[in-house]
Amino acid sequence: MTHVSRRKFLFTTGAAAAASILVHGCTSNGSQSATTGEQAPSAAPAANVSAANAPKVETTKAKLGFIPLTDAAPLIIAKEKGFFAKYGMTDIEVIKQKSWPVTRDNLKIGSSGGGIDGAHILSPMPYLMTINDKVPMYILARLNTNGQAISVAEKFKELNVNLESKSLKDAAIKAKADKKALKMGITFPGGTHDLWMRYWLAAGGINPDQDVVLEAVPPPQMVANMKVNTVDGFCVGEPWNAQLVNQKIGYSALVTGELWKDHPEKAFSMRQDWIEQNPNAAQAILMAILEAQQWCDKAENKEEMCKICSDRKYFNVAAADIIERAKGNIDYGDGRKEQNFAHRMKFWADNASYPYKSHDIWFLTEDIRWGYLPKDTKVQDIVNQVNKEDLWKKAAKAIGVADAEIPASSSRGVETFFDGVKFDPEKPEEYLNSLKIKKV
């Protein structure tokens, strides 16, 4: 079930029409997306709508995609609070996408073909697009760290399935023997949620390619699929894990920051050709997003952020499903609770926005591990091509970020995972060779 072509997209029975669009029409253009050009009633624009440091832009227009996930907030806030307009990008469209494959396909055709120019995106996707789809992409920023979860059905409470997946191993083996293999939802093959799920399962001795079935499911459909027992568990971003708990359908075994503290998650990425044609506009967009990330990370703005994002044209969920985990208050749904948790989603704090190349090296190494990329992939070369940390630094300085607050290194150093495994970005081959369960 590793290859993209063999993945299925799961929906509830009532979403059959949407399933047909996604499975049979993935090359469709922006007509599948709901444009969110209008202003939310609660959002006042930024006071300064003509910043002195705004670059002289080549165009005021760009189409940016997002999936309804809390970590898309910087794009939504940049639109609704007037940060895009502040830096001269007065005609930005922030456009809802139905799934990550739709995001990919709309990026492939670009806005000139009815698609989009950039997006809130799973961090590995720009690499998969650049390598596999031959659509050169640039990563301009990391949108957040942490903020995802692996949630499972209520039936697993008695097994005490949590940070350690080994308690699930016997159930997985039995289900496979009964020809009813456990199905675990992920959002995109080779994307972050897929990699978190695979790492967690493998750490507990469960082979994700042999012992369970991984199914690609659009994030907003995760809870519905759990409700009708189409999936037994899933890995997705918020607010869908919180919604699952609030509806008492399942519980969160873990939040992903427990797997890897302050792990990188979503990125802001744009087509390389668009950036090369509009370098000043790209800088203006990036400046606006960085400022929005700073705004989103302030405690006093969380309520407003969640209210804006909950709107029908964005997430179309109750603000109550977003706010608590956005604040770092985690109700796992099985009696465990955390307040102001250290593993909360971060947009700016602790260099959350900086696109460390060392993190992208890990993503590519994991995609090699699971067969999404060939073993001979020139990892460092492709990271240097796609990751534009230099543009991040330029934009950060332009909005007044002090030099002391800008990372001096492309690497965050050696990373340690929950199971004690270490990843040295200087020695990715050693890490890969040390892993017991893998496809290569």
Swiss-Prot record:
Top-level taxon in the UniProt lineage: Bacteria
UniProt feature, compositional bias: Polar residues: 30-39
Compositionally skewed regions (Low complexity) per UniProt: 40-51
Lipidation (N-palmitoyl cysteine): C26
Positions that bind nitrate: W100, Q148, H193, G237, K266
GO cellular component annotations of the record: plasma membrane
Keywords, in A-Z order: Cell inner membrane, Cell membrane, Ion transport, Lipoprotein, Membrane, Nitrate assimilation, Palmitate, Signal, Transport
Topology of this chain in the membrane: Lipid-anchor
Pfam families cross-referenced by the UniProt entry: NMT1_2
Any one biological process term the GO annotation gives: nitrate assimilation
Location (main, coarse): membrane
Residue positions of covalent lipid attachment, annotated as S-diacylglycerol cysteine: C26
Gene3D superfamilies found in the cross-reference section: Periplasmic binding protein-like II
InterPro entries per UniProt: NrtA/CpmA_ABC-bd_dom, TAT_signal
Compartments it resides in: Cell inner membrane
Range of residues in the leader sequence: 1-25
Disordered, as annotated region: 30-51
Self-association and partners: The complex is composed of two ATP-binding proteins (NrtC and NrtD), two transmembrane proteins (NrtB) and a solute-binding protein (NrtA).
PANTHER family cross-referenced by the UniProt entry: ALIPHATIC SULFONATES-BINDING PROTEIN-RELATED, NITRATE_NITRITE BINDING PROTEIN NRTA
Family that this chain belongs to: Belongs to the CmpA/NrtA family.
Role this protein plays: Part of the ABC transporter complex NrtABCD involved in nitrate uptake. The complex is probably also involved in nitrite transport. NrtA is the substrate-binding protein.
Protein's name according to its UniProt entry: Nitrate/nitrite binding protein NrtA
Organism: Nostoc sp. (strain PCC 7120 / SAG 25.82 / UTEX 2576)
